[in-house]
Amino acid sequence: MKRAEILTGLWLLMFLIYGKECMSQIQNKVCDTIPYELVHNKIIIPVTINGVKTKYIVDTGGKTGTMYDIALEMQANAAGYTRISDVNGQGQNYQEAYVSNVSIGNSYQIKLLKTMVLPKDPFFTDLGVAGILGGDAFSQSVVTFDSRYRIMVINYPYRPEKLKLTDGVPLLDETEYNSFITVKQEEQTMKILFDTGAESFLLYSIQDYNRLADISDIKETNHAHGIVSAGLAGLGNPVEIKKLNIPSIRIMDKEFTNIGCTTSVMNETIIGVDLLKYGKVIIDYMRKRFFFLPFEKGKTDMGGAPVLWNVSILPRNERFEITTIWDSMKDQVSFGDQVININGTSLSNCPMSQIAIEEIMNAIPGDTGYIIIKKDNQERKIEIKKER
């Protein structure tokens, strides 16, 4: 009896000494730390699926999708169809399939993951990725994005140390793995989507603009007609685009002021990947919580309306065309005009690539340049400018 009491006492002492430390290690276990590349404002990470080593864009606003040829290589199995809308509001049906033995980083494993089967996309090909990883790929984890070190940290099954459930706000969509949260714009509340697949800080829904324009201090600074961007379903139809200045948006306890943005035809306003410049984002998919830990306290002035070229050019109809025209250019060019030269760079041998065109435009020094358009067998040189 005495021996049993001594052994019990020893076990209790060992638990008191080591138990707390062991529990701490379990609760704060880091499943994996994954360095990411940031290429054309896309977060890209390595992924291995059924022995196929590849890369994916991390897209917290989308569903997992894989290009058809790579899905075949992964020996994907058909799983029906799904319908989604892209950034241009274009709905399209996609076949779905299951892929097996998914490894994200070294330790995070998924036995079976459903993916949309996407057509071959030159944008994905240019980036060297198989497709996009949506929130559904991280449904059994807690994901931290830390832009200071360009890492994603995947915790399982618990949140990072010292992070309480009450430190975050609820994800609004209980049925999907999209990161919808509530933010405050001036005195109004609005539902937004945190979307790492979106390039800028803020992409403002035209529906939210129509709802809030008369009861807030939103200012329209410019206007255009054209295509918002290339989406999964390709180029959208031309729409009216507004350039806006938003006085204030508060994400949890952090206030951003003087925010410039453009409008989109999406149903929801989007906070994009640029949020990561200002703090860590943690998404607890299992408990449906969102955390934003700003690097600096106090207000951050975002500098007002964005400075953009007064025309946009994209590959379209097997050539390069003007796809967005801001008001200062509406009497000089037309939607669909063929562009054959940008500031001295001939496009005759340029690949039909959005990335290639963006690189040429970004290389123009200063705030002015020129394009040469070809129309009715006539070539015309036209000055272009950056403007707010």
Residue ranges of predicted features:
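Bacterial Sec-dependent N-terminal signal peptides
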Residues: M1-N28
